[in-house]
Swiss-Prot record:
SUPFAM superfamilies: C-terminal domain of RNA polymerase alpha subunit, Insert subdomain of RNA polymerase alpha subunit, RBP11-like subunits of RNA polymerase. This is DNA-directed RNA polymerase subunit alpha. The gene is rpoA. DNA-dependent RNA polymerase catalyzes the transcription of DNA into RNA using the four ribonucleoside triphosphates as substrates. InterPro entries: DNA-dir_RNA_pol_insert (IPR011262), DNA-dir_RNA_pol_RpoA/D/Rpb3 (IPR011263), DNA-dir_RpoA (IPR011773), RBP11-like (IPR036603), RNAP_asu_C (IPR011260), RNApol_insert_sf (IPR036643). The N-terminal domain is essential for RNAP assembly and basal transcription, whereas the C-terminal domain is involved in interaction with transcriptional regulators and with upstream promoter elements. Pfam families: RNA_pol_A_bac, RNA_pol_A_CTD, RNA_pol_L. It comes from Campylobacter concisus (strain 13826). CDD domains: RNAP_alpha_NTD. It catalyses: RNA(n) + a ribonucleoside 5'-triphosphate = RNA(n+1) + diphosphate. GO terms for cellular component: cytoplasm; DNA-directed RNA polymerase complex.
Length: 338
């Protein structure tokens, strides 16, 4: 049953799973009902619009005057050459924001992204097809590679490059796909809390986790404008006054520790139900538990250290009384149901 509170539940868990080099799942929970989508939707939009990438913004081809021209000895006309060029994903090695890269090829040759790698740029999709030229043809062209965010149409790029270059629509974002799913998650017998599961796919210019970090940074920077009227730091998480939010892991059942049957049965007989109860005990208190042997003691100590609450170390400090009170409340509720 949902209780009356004075602040929203503070999410405490974040999980990052690498599916492949360019795909990752990022999960955060638990959120109050409605909060998950409120956060997930703008983050998804920012992933597309704020992630920095590289794109060709202009091309100059020897013997070609405009994008609807054709070139003798090349299978594709210039329009299709440009379409293929925009599909190739460049990454500048120098750290600069703009470079002009020159290329020269003699036929017969099928040109792919791998042929465009050099000391200035890395092609992250080397198998991408560009053009085919016959044995009598020679293809000489230069490309302007620019660093940027989002999408910029060729009409606006026209003003930033020299007249002899054909302006290109620039798709800077390295994020190919960003989707999220809102799932329900159980918190203290309440199934109405929520979990955000992001699936992020990039083209290889940046990794999906790096793209997500950049997205969060962009959101914090945009929110910083409110510092002028609010006496809070919006660039950092605001601490929750909710004990359940702070002690999410500690209020989980000792069953979640996956202890051996001997160790679990000993805790069960001692009516130790929550991980937080172990976190509040020192080694001597554990030794006093009936039938708790040396092996079980060492197992519990190892597991508690693994989850960040080593036995005998005062990690909780000023939060101990608050945790004791919460555990007492939960145990009372459990007894009332029995």
């Amino acid at each position: 049953m949902r209780k009356i509170t004075t602040s929203a539940y503070m999410p405490t868990e974040i999980e990052v799973k690498s599916v492949s080099e360019n795909v990752a799942n990022i999960t955060a929970y638990p959120f109050e009902a409605g909060y998950a989508v409120t956060l997930a939707h703008p983050l998804r939009r920012l992933l597309y619009t704020s992630t920095v990438g590289f794109a060709p913004i202009g091309v100059k081809i020897k013997g070609v005057s405009h994008e609807f021209d054709s070139m003798r000895g090349m299978l594709e006309d210039v329009a299709f050459f440009i379409i293929n060029l925009k599909k190739i994903r460049f990454k500048l090695k120098s750290g600069s924001e703009r470079e002009v890269i020159e290329y020269s090829f003699k036929g017969p040759k099928e040109i792919t992204g791998a042929d465009l790698n050099n000391d200035l740029v890395e092609i992250v999709n080397p198998d991408a097809y560009l053009a085919t030229i016959n044995e009598d043809a020679e293809l000489n062209f230069s490309v302007i590679i620019q660093k940027g965010i989002g999408y910029v149409p060729s009409e606006e790029i026209r003003e930033e490059i020299e007249d002899e270059y054909i302006a290109l629509d620039a798709f800077f974002t390295p994020v190919k796909k960003a989707v999220y799913e809102i799932q329900n998650v159980l918190v203290e017998d309440d199934p109405d809390y929520e979990k955000i599961v992001f699936t992020i796919t990039t083209d290889g210019q940046v990794g999906p986790v790096e793209a997500f970090k950049n997205c969060l940074e962009a959101m914090y920077q945009q929110m910083s404008v409110f510092k002028g009227i609010l006496d809070i730091d919006v660039s950092a998480p605001v601490a929750s006054s909710s004990a359940s939010g702070e002690f999410s892991k500690l209020l989980s059942s000792v069953e979640d520790l996956n202890l051996s049957a001997r160790s679990f049965n000993c805790l069960d007989k001692a009516e130790i139900r929550f991980i937080g109860e172990l976190a509040l005990m020192d080694e001597n208190e554990l030794k006093e538990l009936k039938n708790l042997g040396k092996k079980s003691l060492e197992e519990i100590k190892a597991v508690m250290e693994e989850i960040g609450y080593p036995v005998g170390v005062d990690v909780l400090k000023d939060s101990k009384e608050q945790l004791r009170k919460k555990i007492t409340e939960l145990k009372s509720q459990m007894s009332a149901k029995e």
